[in-house]
Design a protein with these regions (language model features):
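Glycine-rich phosphate-binding loop
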Residues: 114
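Residues forming the Rossmann-fold NAD(P)(H) cofactor-binding site
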Residues: 117
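Non-catalytic substrate-recognition and accessory regions of acyl/acetyltransferase enzymes
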Residues: 1-111, 121, 125-138, 148, ...
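Short histidine/acidic/glycine/proline-rich micro-motifs that form metal-
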Residues: 140-144
Length: 181
């Protein structure tokens, strides 16, 4: 066998081993999530990772009575599970007629990879399934350093972004509103 064929053979073998390792870790993480009572919403395979989107339910509360909404994404690479899971936090209010979006938490290493869109789309799916017509939220003052990116992100998902003209508010710099059409 030529040297080039040997190199390609070894490279193919390494790729297969990485894919197998990612798949095994993905299966293990799915089992862990299900054993904790989480609902696995989807598993997405990308070139470099598997993404397990899940919803965290609190113990002994039926889904239709659950006020809190926690949606996370476990990122599995060939090195294992990648750090803290990106997480969306929201809650139902006004007798389950509105959702209030609290936060989308994400490590810098996950920004601009589509994970925030996946989380927000999952929340929008919940709103549509539950016939929720409105989602509200605030843009926190801690996000002022990347406000342009946030405005683009929320407008891309059909949210109205209302930036505050009053700089005296120490907690927020804007409001978010999504109305189901």
């Amino acid at each position: 066998m030529s040297v080039i064929k040997q190199l390609f053979s070894k490279l193919s073998s390494l790729k297969f081993k990485r894919k197998t390792a990612i798949q095994k870790e993905t299966t293990a993480q799915i089992d862990i999530l299900k054993n904790k009572g989480f609902e696995v919403l989807s598993v997405t395979k990308t070139e470099k990772a598997n993404l397990i989107m899940y919803r965290h339910f609190l113990d002994d509360i039926p889904e239709e009575e659950e006020i809190r909404i926690f949606i996370g994404i476990s990122v599995i690479t060939s090195k294992g599970r990648s750090g803290r899971d990106p997480m969306l936090k929201a809650f139902f209010k006004n007798n389950f007629t509105t959702i209030s979006l609290e936060d989308i938490e994400m490590a810098d290493s996950f920004i601009n990879q589509g994970l925030g869109s996946m989380l927000l789309n999952a929340l929008l799916d919940i709103a549509k399934k539950r016939n929720i017509r409105r989602i509200t939220g605030e843009i926190s003052r801690v996000d002022i350093g990347h406000i342009e990116r946030l405005v683009h992100f929320y407008e891309k998902h059909n949210f109205e972004v209302i930036l505050c003209s009053d700089s005296a508010d120490v907690y927020k710099i804007g409001d978010l509103v999504w109305n189901r059409s």
